[in-house]
Amino acid sequence: MGVIEIENLSRKFGDFTAVDGLTLTIAEGEVFGLLGPNGAGKTTTIRMLAGLIGKTSGDARVAGCRVGDPDTARKLRSLVGLMPEEAGLSPDLSAARTLDFYGRLYGVSHGMRALRTERLLTMLDLWDRRNDRVRTFSKGMKQRLTIARALINDPPVLFLDEPTANLDPEGAKTVRDFLLELKADKRTILLNTHQLAEAERVCDRVGIMHTRLIAVGTPDGLRGATSQHATAIQLAVVTDAVVVAARNTSSADVTVAGNTITVPVDKPERDNPELVKAIAAAGGEIQFISGTAPSLEETYLRLLGSEKNDKVAR
């Protein structure tokens, strides 16, 4: 059983389907990233799981609490930390007083509030601004403070809606390093993002979403399952016989640039030995071999493109 269990979860707004039959299990201590374009249903999913909006159909449990059940709603709020899309911070409170206020709401003791405030603000590079009013903060600083607010009661589950959006590279690195620390603490995290590089660095698994879940897996697994690698072979001379031999080993187009021939391959460990053998048999004098793996962005765009084509066909 997972800490987050979602079964056939859907949400409609009138005739518009925002989330369509989402089924997903997220294990304890896992960092899971939802990827998708605007309007894909990522924020709606987080809002449903946090109990902020109701579902149209389906079922979900978070940390043992059934989402939408009034008997466990209070417990659910205590077990889940939420960084929403909009910060919703009081502009006249300082960073430290903001965390103290929310800590009191959750019943955190005075001593523990002070310890967590110092730890969270230090880790998110806000400690030097702890006594400054939120109205003086940049958008990125408010975003980091919102993450700290979500953790003031030390919840085992954390939902983050675009945690690195609007951050400069330094701010994004601060948040990324912070998430890696949380990951080491075995906290279960569900985040959504447009930042594919961030997801690749932080997430154990990712799901590509476009109202429904298109694909789920590790970043490496998705790349290998949906996109081709390429092997580039530099030769003394590229002859017609070498090109023919390379094409006979690949179902995709072979390209030639100068003395380098590039061949798409599905599984390099399986296909490259056969490719090298065929080129050598055709008289090719191989000087250097290199390989390139598809990026997560290429995989993401390929899957989204296929999904859009399927929707048009349907």
Which residues does each predicted region cover?
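Helix-to-loop junction immediately C-terminal to a conserved catalytic motif
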Residues: A50
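Conserved ABC transporter NBD signature motif
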Residues: G58-D69, K75-L76
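Conserved ABC ATPase "signature" region
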Residues: D100, R104, G111-R129
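Hydrophobic anchor residue at the start of the ABC signature
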Residues: I147
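Catalytic Walker B motif of ABC-type/P-loop ATPase nucleotide-binding domains
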Residues: L158-E162
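ABC transporter nucleotide-binding domain
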Residues: R176-D266
